Structures are given as C-alpha cells and as structure tokens.
C-alpha cells in the first residue's frame, strides 16, 4: 500500500529538486549577459546588489543574478564553472538546509554561491571545516572568487592573536574550524574587557562535513579548563583493585551504555582490598576512582580507543581512525587509563567554560551544511537542528555496484574470506580498499596478506603509518594497489583511479625540499609532521625527536615515471633558490609543508620563489599525468576501485561513506561487506537468533550465508544502534538545553557588564535588594516589634557596609516600622556608596566604575565555574531518581533552576560586599620596569588573577 502511494506521489526529494529547476533555467539565461561584462563591471555588481538590499529587496530577489555573477567570477578566476546541480546545491544551502552531495561532486565550489549571496548583507558568513588545513586552503582558493567580487575574506586559525581573529571575524566571509569557532565563543565570554571580544553576533553558517560535526561530535563538549591537583596514588591503587576484580562476579559490564555496575560482592572486595569501610566516605572517597578504573579495564581498549605514544595515552577518533593529541577524556577517565597503562598520570582539570556543538551551532539564526551522507540521519537533523536534508543529483550517473553482504559464523572464517577476495581482485589488477574498525584488526589482516605475498599499504593511527598517509592515498587507486585503512570516514581525500598525480608531484617536491630547508629533528620543536594533504593537518605526526629523519617515499615504484632532464634541472634550481632565500635547514618542518601546499594550489601569490615552485610543480604533475591518465583508463576497463568493508559500523552513514570511496564522478567501482556473528554489532544487538539458526543447519566457519532473515537482522541491529545513539544524543541535548538556557542568560548578563559604560545604576539596585534581604532576615513584620532582632540587624548592616560602623546605632531603628527601617537602611547604604565613590576618586577619578566592572566580572566568573561543577554533580545524582518513579530530567530542570537563582543572588551579594569593603593601595611602580598589561582571558581564564585596576590593587580590609 505504502509503496503504491509512493509511486503515485513520487519521491519527495525529486519533487523538491524539480522546484529548483526553473531558477536554474533563469540563472542559465543570464549567463551570456553576465559573461559580456568587463572585470570592473562584474565587481560593480556587488555594490549594486548591496544598494538593492538597502532599498528593501530580499536575498531571494537577488539570488538568480547573484549566482550568475559568482559562476562567471569562478570561471574567470578559478577556471571552474558551476554545474546546474551545483547551483541547486547552492540554493539548498541558502535556504538553511543540508545538501547531500556525493564524493567528488565539488562541495567546496558550491559553498561560494550562498556565501557570496549572504555575505552581501555585511553581517558575516562562517564557513566551517573539520580541520585547519582545509579552512586555509578554501579561504585562499575559493576566497579568490569573493575577493575578486569585492567581499572581504577572513581566516581563523589556532595560534592567531585575538587581534588577527577579530579582523577575520569582521570580514564578510570567514573560514574557520568547528573547534576554533567554539573555543573563541567561550573565550569571548571570559573576556575581561570589551576590546578583547573577537566575534560579532552569529548570522549564517555553512558547515562542511556537517554529519561529522553535528552528529559524530554532538556529544563532545568543548571545554576550557584550569588544572586541579588530584592524588595520582588513588588512580594507581584503584587500577590495582580493578585488576583483582572479576567480571560477572564483582561487576557487570553494560556494553550498550558503555558503563560498569559493581555488585555487592564487588563493593565488599574493593573495600577489603583498599582497607576502607565505605567507598562513598566523603572524607576519603574511592567510588569514583574504582568505577573509572574498571571502565578503563573493560571499555577502553588499547589500539582501538587509544594508543600509547611517548609515554602518553593518545585518544583515537573512532569515526576517522585519526589520533587526537591534546584531547583528554574528562571526569578522571583519562587518568584511570594512564594508571592502567603505567604511564605518568597528568593532573585533572576544572571546567571554566563549556558548550556542546549542538548548542553552539543552534546560536546561528540560519544554519546549513554539506556532506556526502546525511539521508540516514534525516530524522535527527530535523528534530534536533530543524534542518531538512535534500539529496543533490550527481552530475554524472553513479556506476558503482554494491554486492550483498556475506556473513560468516566466526571471525576467523570472515578474515580468511576477505584475504581471498583481495587476492582475487589483486590478480585481476583492480585496486582494493579495505576498511577496518581498529588498529589491531588492520594489523591482523596485514599479517595474513604478508603470508600470501600480496604487497599492500597500511593506514591506521600508528605514527609510522600516519606519516605516510599522503603517500598511501596517492597510490590507492593505482592498478593492483591494496590499501588497508582504519575508518576511511573523514579522511577527506578522493581516491583517483590510476593514481593521484597531484599528490605524487607534491611528494616529489617534499622529498627534495625537506632535507635542504627543514630543521633537523634535534632543533625542530615540532618533531615529525605528516604531509599536509586534503584532510590532513590535524593531529598527525609524532612529537618525539627521532635520531634520523628521511622524507623519501617508502613504496618502491611509487612515482609513475622518471622525470625528464629539463624538469629535474628546474627542480634543482628551485631547491637552490629556496636554500639561498631561507638558509640550509633553518625552517620548521610545518613552514616547509605550507610552502609546498601553497605552491601546489591555485591561490594567487606574489612571492617569486613560490611562483617558481608552482611552475616546477605543474611540470612534474604534467609528466606524471601522462602515465596516470593512461593507467586510469586501464583501471576503468578492469572495473574500478573495489571497496571491502570488514564490519558493519554502528551507523549506516559510516558504511555509506566507505562505499562512496568507489565510483566517484561517474567512474565504475564495486563494494562488498564481509561480516561475522562475532562482530561487535551483531554480538551486542541480537546475533543470537542467527547463531542458533547457523548451529541448526551446521554451517561451516568458512561458508558464507545469504538469507533475508540475516539481512533484516543486520539492518535492524544498525537501526537499533542508530536509535540508541540518537536517544543518547537527544538526552544529552535535553540536559544540555537546561545548561544552555542558563549559559545564554549568564553570558548575556556578562556581555552587558562588559559593554556597560556606567554600571552604577545596576550596583545601586543590587545594594537595595541586598539591604532588603538583610532586613527580612531579622525583622518579620508579622511579629510584634519586641521580637525583632534589631541588634543583629545593625551588626549585619555594619558588617556589609563598614562605613556605617560610625553612623548606624541600634537606637536609630528602635521605634520605626518595618517599612521605615527598610527605607532608612537603603538610604544609609546609598549614602555610604556615594561616600565610598568620593573616597576612591581621591586616588583616581572614575576608579569606582573600574572597580564595579572588576568585581562584577570576578563574581560572575568564579560563581559560574562553581555552578558548572554543581550542575555536573546534580546531573549524576538525579539519574538515580528514576528508580523512585521521578522523571530525572524534570528534577534536573527544577533543582538546576534553584541553583541558578542561588548563584545569581550570590553574585549580587558578593559584589556589593566586595565593593563596600575593598580599599585601594597605592603601588609604587618604577617607570623603567612598569609591568606588562594583565593577560587576556584566553591566556589566563581566571579573572580573579587579574593584577588590579591601573596602579590600584583590590584588597580586603
């Protein structure tokens, strides 16, 4: 019935695409007219569009002509013309949707269309990429189009100064990474001066690889933290206890929730081994350490979730297989893993500011994104972000053939079948890409292929393999190439049939330039950094100095041909010119990588050396292309790239990303998944039924089975996992929404304090409220006056407002009514405040205004930090209330709101108290050694560490 209805109504996505066709027709009809314009006339269109916006026209009114202008500019500047389907992609992005575009369909070029159109408003467009290299490349490469048309283009990179970032954020179009954007948002909300704020209000955002950022990273909070000392011996002893405890006897493991639960026997055993009577004793708490130690033992597996490098535990991203140096698991988990591995335990951190990507990107009034795979997560994008997904048709039809899955009884049988399939394809000469889910499994398959004598390349998170990433990817599409990769998702690299001549030319430059220009490892603080290729540049390369360094490619016969004598001579000349300009072995390796990257891209440059490098690069590429293009034709004839999946991922989207490596831009290709009943997915989510079926039919371990029941079991398992993780992300989102409302309130208040020229009105309001609180605490109007605590009230007022010690007496209040007492004390406090201000003016005119801002910010920041910890503790505590038939989320909302109100009251009270009691002290500073300004919040996030106001130092009496 449903299928019949769908046939009658048609695919809703096709209907959506049809709506855009008339606009595409209109844009195409403008092409000849726009092409006839001179460069100056084309640039003048930007001014014309802005004037039309000022006159009341909308962006939608301008869209056809603006898109035609961008298409023409791209033709002139980049020699690239937007296809019709790319125009549709641009419209989808402009409307605040997600455009699903297959690998190799030119997402980067598509983004120029909505970026230009929305950039005309002057309110700012952010184009967000997953790593710094891509942000820089796109700002230089695609930025040419925008600069040609008169828009300003900014780039935000890690390590830039706040001033450089501010300039970039003020541009019409800004390229940045998701993490830097988030951290800058947090830093802005820790600034102690409005001049330190870098970002302006968010307007429109285009996210590249939107599924990676909004779904895979959704549960990862961005955290700015300060270090807190914690006893490392507790982690070590807890690790010893965890080694003694036995699974299923002392604790149970919930693989789905990635959690451990201690049994009664487990609690007793842990208490006995530690020699304590109660793991939860507040004076000597052990429960947290023991739970984390058991989690580290059972749920965090070496070479799957992390690797140990240079005596450090480094996280491996489960989606991309990349190492994430600098990232640490929070809440003491990282320390527990360090204790388990016997490496030095680093100190814990206290959260100073935090936000999740979910809430960060929901701050944009208009949000859009691009990815190769979003359809499977359509429901989540809709419910969480209110984003529609539109699948953009490919420019050429997809020719990839996806074979049905083969399922084996045991893992051993599966790996044997995978090895045989590789041997079969290799014998035909077809390139093969094998996706594995962990370092350990990739090495197991590698060992099997070595035994069979099949040459292959291994790409996983191990440093020695990571450094060869560009080299491995460059030849993954060559005839007979076999590549084993851990999670190809997010590697951001197209595998080109016949070999990637661009990469090969880049590596040839690198091979010759690095030994001459790069500092030797002993002097190179950056250690070894891998080739910065597409998708590279984030967290690769070891940091330990190596005794000897070589930049020569490892693979024999890597280069498709010997270079001609003329090109070799040009290469020698450019290397000599580079040494003359920069000196022998004087540059950090990363700087040389940048030189090569800029030379091999199309961004405009003035530097004569880079222009010479670019000329040599193009000559090398042209010679290699003669061979790779011929090989491309041969590989196409053989059937293209064959992709083998060795396990179903928890998300169908990641499987689709692996499959999508084959059949790019209309090339042929094929894919097949090999699975076993011992795979994690089937083991955790319902492989028992299938296992019983196999036992019943006595299926051998090396015999694959295909059965409708099996296919439906697999799909159900993946759907269950997707729903499970969606529910988890939804739960995180619902809880974080509570924090988000509070965060928005406190950050808005903080911004008002930063921007407020005169905070006196706010402070006097605080004074009146605080006096009212003190009066209510000691005077109850419903009781007779003889029961009022006038003496305590007087003492408390004198404590809060020291200037009243001389003027306020108990007898002043004796015969007054409640209202009269309140009015009298408020008036006295206001007079005391005026007197305090006059006193401070004798030190420096306007000092009270600076003091008001200083103490307000100090209290907001200090109490917000404490509040974050309280909310984290509350979140853990309410989880247990579900057993008492209470909704934990409602409890969290209600109690969190109470905590928030209490924090706001404390900010008010503490600020009033501090302003009344502090006394400035004149600090004699010799002119010659005048101190540098206090660091910004980004460098020193704790405003309580600020060194004072001018030469005054805030001290309590």
UniProtKB/Swiss-Prot annotation:
User: Which UniProt keyword terms apply here?
Assistant: ATP-binding, Cell inner membrane, Cell membrane, Cytoplasm, Membrane, Nucleotide-binding, Protein transport, Thylakoid, Translocase, Translocation, Transport
Please, which domain of life does this record's source organism belong to?
A: Bacteria
Q: Which GO terms describe its biological process?
A: intracellular protein transmembrane transport; protein import; protein targeting; protein transport by the Sec complex
Where are the compositionally biased (Low complexity) regions? 929-947
Q: Which cell locations does it reside in?
A: Cell inner membrane; Cellular thylakoid membrane; Cytoplasm
Q: Which PROSITE patterns match?
A: SECA, SECA_MOTOR_DEAD
The protein depicted here goes by the name Protein translocase subunit SecA
């Amino acid at each position: 019935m449903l299928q019949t209805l769908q046939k009658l109504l048609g695919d809703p996505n096709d209907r959506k695409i049809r709506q855009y066709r008339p606009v595409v027709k209109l844009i195409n009809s403008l092409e000849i007219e726009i092409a006839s314009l001179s460069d100056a006339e084309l640039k003048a269109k930007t001014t014309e569009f802005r004037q039309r916006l000022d006159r009341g026209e909308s962006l939608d009114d301008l869209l056809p002509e603006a898109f035609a202008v961008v298409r023409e500019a791209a033709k002139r500047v980049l020699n690239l013309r937007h296809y019709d389907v790319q125009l549709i992609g641009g419209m989808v992005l402009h409307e605040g949707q997600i455009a699903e575009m297959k690998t190799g369909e030119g997402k980067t070029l598509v983004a120029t269309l909505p970026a230009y159109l929305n950039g005309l408003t002057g309110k700012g467009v952010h184009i967000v990429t997953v790593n710094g290299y891509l942000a820089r490349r796109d700002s230089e490469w695609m930025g040419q189009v925008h600069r040609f048309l008169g828009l300003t283009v900014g780039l935000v990179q890690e390590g830039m100064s706040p001033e450089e970032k501010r300039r970039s954020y003020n541009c019409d179009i800004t390229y940045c990474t998701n993490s830097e954007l988030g951290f800058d948002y947090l830093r802005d909300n820790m600034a102690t001066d409005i001049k330190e704020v870098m970002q302006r209000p968010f307007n429109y955002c285009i996210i590249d690889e939107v599924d990676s950022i909004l779904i895979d990273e959704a549960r990862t909070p961005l955290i700015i933290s300060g270090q807190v000392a914690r006893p490392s011996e507790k982690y070590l002893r807890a690790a010893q206890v965890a080694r003694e405890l036995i699974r299923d006897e002392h604790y149970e493991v919930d693989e789905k929730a990635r959690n451990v639960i201690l049994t009664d026997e487990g609690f007793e055993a842990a208490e006995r081994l530690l020699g304590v009577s109660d793991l939860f004793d507040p004076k000597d708490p052990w429960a947290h350490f023991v739970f984390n130690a058991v989690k580290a033992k059972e749920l965090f597996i070496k070479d799957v979730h992390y690797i140990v490098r240079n005596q450090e535990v480094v996280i491996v991203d489960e989606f991309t297989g990349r190492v994430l140096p600098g990232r640490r698991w929070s809440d003491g988990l990282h320390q527990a893993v360090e204790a388990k591995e016997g490496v030095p335990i680093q100190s814990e951190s206290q959260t100073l500011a935090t936000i999740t990507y979910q809430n960060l990107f929901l701050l944009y009034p208009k949000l859009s994104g691009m990815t190769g795979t979003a359809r499977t997560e359509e429901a989540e994008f809709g419910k969480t972000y209110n984003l529609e997904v539109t699948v953009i048709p490919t420019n050429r039809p997809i020719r990839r053939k996806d074979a049905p899955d083969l399922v084996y009884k045991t893992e051993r049988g599966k790996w044997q079948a995978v090895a045989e399939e590789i041997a079969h394809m290799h014998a035909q000469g077809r390139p093969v890409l094998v996706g594995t889910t962990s370092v350990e499994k990739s090495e197991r398959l590698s060992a099997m292929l070595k035994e069979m004598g099949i040459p292959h390349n291994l790409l996983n998170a191990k440093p020695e393999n990571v450094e060869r990433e560009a080299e491995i990817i460059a030849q993954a599409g060559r005839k007979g190439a076999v590549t084993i990769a851990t999670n190809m998702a997010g590697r951001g690299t197209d595998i080109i049939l016949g070999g990637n001549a661009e990469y090969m030319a880049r590596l040839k430059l690198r091979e010759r330039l690095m030994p001459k220009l790069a500092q030797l490892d002993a002097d190179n603080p950056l250690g070894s950094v891998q080739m910065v290729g597409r998708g590279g540049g984030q967290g690769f390369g070891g940091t330990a100095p190596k005794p000897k360094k070589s930049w020569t490619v490892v693979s024999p016969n890597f280069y498709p041909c010997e270079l001609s004598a003329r090109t070799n001579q040009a290469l020698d000349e450019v290397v000599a010119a580079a040494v003359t300009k920069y000196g022998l072995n004087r540059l950090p390796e990363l700087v040389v990588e940048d030189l090569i990257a800029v030379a091999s891209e199309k961004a405009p440059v003035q530097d004569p050396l880079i222009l010479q490098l670019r000329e040599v690069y193009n000559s090398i590429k042209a010679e290699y292309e003669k061979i790779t293009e011929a090989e491309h034709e041969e590989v196409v004839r053989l059937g293209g790239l064959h992709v083998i999946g060795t396990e179903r991922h928890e998300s169908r989207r990641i499987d689709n990303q692996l499959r999508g490596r084959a059949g790019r831009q209309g090339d042929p290709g094929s894919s097949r998944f090999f699975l076993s009943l011992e795979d994690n997915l089937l083991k955790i989510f319902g492989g028992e039924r299938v296992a019983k079926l196999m036992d019943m039919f006595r299926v051998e371990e090396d015999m694959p089975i295909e059965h409708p029941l099996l296919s439906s079991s697999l799909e159900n398992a993946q759907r269950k996992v997707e729903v499970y993780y969606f529910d988890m992300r939804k739960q995180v989102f619902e809880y974080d929404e509570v924090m988000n409302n509070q965060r928005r309130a406190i950050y808005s208040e903080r911004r008002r304090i930063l921007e407020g020229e005169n905070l006196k009105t706010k402070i006097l309001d605080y004074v009146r409220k605080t006096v009212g609180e003190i009066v209510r605490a000691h005077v109850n109007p419903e009781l007779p006056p003889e029961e009022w605590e006038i003496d305590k009230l007087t003492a408390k007022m004198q404590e809060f407002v020291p200037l009243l010690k001389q003027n306020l007496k108990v007898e002043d209040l004796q015969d007054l009514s409640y209202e009269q007492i309140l009015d009298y004390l408020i008036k006295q406090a206001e007079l005391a405040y005026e007197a305090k201000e006059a006193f401070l003016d004798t030190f420096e005119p306007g000092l009270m205004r600076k003091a008001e801002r200083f103490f307000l910010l100090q209290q907001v920041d200090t109490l917000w930090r404490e509040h974050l910890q309280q909310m984290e503790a509350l979140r853990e505590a309410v989880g247990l209330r579900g057993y008492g038939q209470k909704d934990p989320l409602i409890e969290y909302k209600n109690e969190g709101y109470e905590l928030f109100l209490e924090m706001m009251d404390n900010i008010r009270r503490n600020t009033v108290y501090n302003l009344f009691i502090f006394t400035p002290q004149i600090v004699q500073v010799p002119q010659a050694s005048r101190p540098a300004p206090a660091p910004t919040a980004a460098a020193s996030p704790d405003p309580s560490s600020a060194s004072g106001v001018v030469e005054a130092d805030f001290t309590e009496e």
